[in-house]
Amino acid sequence: MKFRPCIDIHNGKVKQIVGGSLKDAGDQARENLVSGQDAAFYAELYKNAGLKGGHVILLNGKDSEYYEATRNQALKALAAYPGGLQIGGGVCPDNAEDYLKAGASHVIVTSYVFKDGQLSWENLKKIEEIAGKEHLVLDLSCRKKTISILL
């Protein structure tokens, strides 16, 4: 068994949020825990414990007033553990190379390559050209939803 640590960053703070509670409008989420430590603290902790393959996730979108604070926390984590963490949350061709240069081992993409339940091969090719397939993780996250079928 492998432990894969995670650093979720929302509104510039390391948090554990209640699954499915994240709302872009108002930058709101129900919280289980808001840490008093910054993201670099956890990155150092994981590095010192020899835990690789963890990830840093930016939970604020680019339009959020908190985006820069969230992004700065993520960059501090990558600097504290270069090559030890993956990064996700709004990753696209415009920022993938910057995250890799900042120390991310991989970039995680979801919404950039998946639109309306379909894989965009064009977008996948674009991000692969920037990041390289050896540094690219496709996130196939799913969430239980009610499905209505009309007969």
Annotate each predicted stretch with a short phrase.
Residues K2-I9, G54-V56, G83-G89, V107-V109, ...:
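Hydrophobic faces of well-ordered beta-strands that scaffold small-molecule active sites
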Residues H10, K15-A25, L100-L151:
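Conserved anion-binding
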Residues G20-E44:
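Short catalytic helix/loop segments, enriched in acidic residues and glycine
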Residues F41-I57, A102:
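Catalytic domains of carbohydrate-active enzymes, especially glycoside hydrolases
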Residues L45-A49, A77, Y99-L100, I127:
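Generic structural signal for hydrophobic
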Residues L51-N72, S111-Q118:
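Glycine-rich, proline-tolerant flexible connector loops at the mouths of alpha/beta enzymes
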Residues S64-Q86, L124-S141:
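Alpha-helix-loop-beta-strand connector modules within alpha/beta enzyme cores
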Residues Q73-H106:
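Catalytic cores of alpha/beta
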